[in-house]
């Protein structure tokens, strides 16, 4: 006659092994998978979009942190290709001046980056493709929503991924 308790005892082992495998999978995801170069570049682009956003009640301290975050996302020098408004090579000083003008003209802005695709060229270089959306209001009361396809080149400098160039293309919407 078979012992029914042996079946339950074996079931506890199987359950414990499955639980340990699930815990190992979760640990792997948080420890390794979220730190891949592709994930780090995607997070950097999302952080840049967040820093470019602005609300009407934003404090000076928050604004300074965002300006620092924006400037820190780019290599020095970097190249920008956005219509006739912002085109050419930017060193750190020129980039900070442009960020200051942007923030002074805008009273409210919601900037998002979506459909981020990273193509690793080698361990230190990557191309990033995404859609950028600006929905905002200028201080003169004009408002607009702009959607662009963006191609960026990223370079890894001192272990951090920085944007070396950005090219904007118009999108029909």
Language-model segments: residues:
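Hydrophobic pocket/interface hotspot
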Residues: 70-71, 78, 95, 128, ...
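N-terminal alpha-helical signal peptides/signal-anchor transmembrane segments
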Residues: 45-56
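N-terminal Sec-pathway targeting helices
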Residues: 2-20
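Short, solvent-exposed secondary-structure junction/capping segments
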Residues: 49, 68-86
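Surface-exposed, charged secondary-structure patches
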Residues: 94-140
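Short beta-strand edge/turn micro-motifs at domain boundaries
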Residues: 13-14, 29-34, 125-129, 141-173
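Ser/Thr/Pro/Gly-rich low-complexity linker/stalk segments immediately outside membranes or between
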Residues: 30-47
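Hydrophobic alpha-helical membrane-insertion segments, chiefly the h-region
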Residues: 20-30
């Amino acid at each position: 006659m078979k012992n029914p308790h042996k079946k339950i005892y074996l079931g506890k082992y199987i359950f414990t092994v499955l639980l340990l495998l699930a815990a190992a999978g979760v640990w792997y995801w948080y420890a390794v998978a979220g730190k891949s170069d592709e994930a780090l570049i995607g997070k950097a682009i999302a952080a840049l979009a967040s820093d470019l956003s602005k609300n009407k009640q934003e404090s000076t301290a928050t604004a300074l942190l965002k300006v620092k975050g924006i400037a820190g996302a780019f290599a020095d020098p970097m190249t920008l290709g956005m219509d006739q408004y912002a085109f050419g090579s930017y060193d750190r000083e020129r980039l900070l001046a442009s960020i200051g003008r942007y923030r002074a003209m805008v009273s409210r802005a919601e900037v998002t980056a979506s459909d981020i695709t990273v193509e690793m060229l080698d361990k230190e270089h990557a191309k990033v493709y995404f859609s950028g959306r600006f929905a905002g209001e200028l201080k003169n009361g004009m408002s607009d929503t702009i959607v662009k396809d963006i191609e960026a080149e990223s370079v890894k400098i001192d272990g951090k991924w920085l944007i070396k160039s950005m090219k904007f293309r118009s999108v029909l919407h």
